[in-house]
UniProtKB/Swiss-Prot annotation:
This is Putative N(4)-(beta-N-acetylglucosaminyl)-L-asparaginase CG1827. It comes from Drosophila melanogaster (Fruit fly). Heterotetramer of two alpha and two beta chains arranged as a dimer of alpha/beta heterodimers. Pfam families: Asparaginase_2. Disulfide bonds join 97-102, 196-212, 354-381. The active site is at residue 243. Its EC number is 3.5.1.26. Transmembrane segments: none annotated. One of its GO terms (molecular function) is peptidase activity.
Amino acid sequence: MRRHLRASLWILCLATMAFSILAAVNTSPKPTLTSAFSGKAGTTAVKANKTTGELLPMVINTWNFTAANVLAWRILKQSKGGLRQTRNAVVEGCSKCEKLQCDRTVGYGGSPDELGETTLDAMVMDGATMDVGAVAGLRRIKDAIKVARHVLEHTQHTMLVGDAASAFANAMGFESESLVTPESKDMWLQWTAENCQPNFWKNVHPDPKVSCGPYKPRPTPLTRWKEDRARNEYEIGRKNHDTIGMIAIDVESNIHAGTSTNGARHKIPGRVGDSPIPGAGAYADNEVGAAVATGDGDVMMRFLPSLLAVETMRAGKPPAEAAQEGLRRILKHHKDFMGALIAVDRLGNYGAACYGLAEFPFMVSSPAGADGPTRLETVKCIGGQDKVNIVAL
């Protein structure tokens, strides 16, 4: 009897010790692991003990538009953690690029259309409310991104276009002025002197490859339409087809995204690209993250790559894979296009992907910078210098 009692007490003692050990393991602190994307396609650097507070707040934008990023970061830091400043940061950052005429592809005095006029497209999206304000084909108003903000804050609409958008801007206190500069006028005169080459016309006469318009539709058998879809006649590049896309996130993962551009050089009057289109030029959702795009807007807007990138992150993929996915859908149909995509999740992890260039530069400001908050990063492009196999989706 005593032997059985002694054995029972020994078993009870062992069980108590085991329970104590398990409790200690389960309650001990664990290191946090967060992936910080290095900017190289398909690679990540996993850094231990990274917390949201160290990655956020954040400002990230397309291309090496440093001054725009620095200003946006300064504005974001006006409040602790960037709270209530993400909209101001995006609007003022993009506005800085408009004033500086970044690459002559943002703001006034760049990318004249067939009539020699510069028109502007811009958008602001709020990731908390999913509200959007945008303008397209804006004429005679320099502050495109600020007019887009007024559409967001003072109307129930998403987008205003053309002369009506300009009239709205006037009513909101913006002054009308010419967007043509001596440089943009010379650019247009040289283009017309070279028989309006290149241009965006097809299936018209006279032959748009050798002559200016006016053009008339050319009767074309249906078997010829696919042949004439080729876009190789007009070389798309960053100097004639560019956008600033910017994302700002505060420490509570409140997100704004914005874009601004003067569109494609020598475009047909009335053309609107991807920049002011929600889901194409930019998309933001506080629950997931945001994405911004740049490149051949006529192609990219058909596939809503920014929306696709955000939804890919929603499905659990990291930002770098989400950015690549946004481009793969396009490459299934268009192997001759140029474009880039930046994706950021709500915690501040980010990635980028590009196609048709050697590499794509972008600006990042966040507390995670080793040599200061603001840095230039690059990503090597698929289809830039080396041939790659495109996975059909």
